[in-house]
Amino acid sequence: MASCSRAQVISLYRMLMKESKKFPSYNYRTYALRRVKDGFRENLHVDNPRTLDLLINQARENLAVIKRQVSIGHLYSAQRTVVEKEPHL
């Protein structure tokens, strides 16, 4: 597979962040967002093309997993936590 450009990596990062924000559960949503940020930050200085391709493929697989889990989360929604509830004024 050809090496990915910076624009492709940024696009993948944005897709992961956008999809992670769709989790109906606060806990899953914050975990996914934190995990995406930390994963990309951890691998910021990877220069090896093979390693970069491997990481990009893993990120694409993770995007597919997140999309599936978001769909499942919407099908089987649970009661909202205190953090998610609207304040009563």
Curated annotation (Swiss-Prot):
Record has Transmembrane helix as a keyword: no
Entry keyword annotation includes Mitochondrion: yes
Keyword annotations from UniProtKB, A to Z: Mitochondrion, Nucleus
Cellular component terms per the entry's GO annotation: L-cysteine desulfurase complex; mitochondrion; nucleus
Localization, UniProt: Mitochondrion; Nucleus
Pathway in which this enzyme or protein is active: Cofactor biosynthesis; iron-sulfur cluster biosynthesis
BP GO terms, sorted: iron-sulfur cluster assembly
Function description: Required for nuclear and mitochondrial iron-sulfur protein biosynthesis.
Stated family: Belongs to the complex I LYR family.
Protein name per the record: LYR motif-containing protein 4
Provenance organism: Danio rerio
Lineage: Eukaryota, Metazoa, Chordata, Craniata, Vertebrata
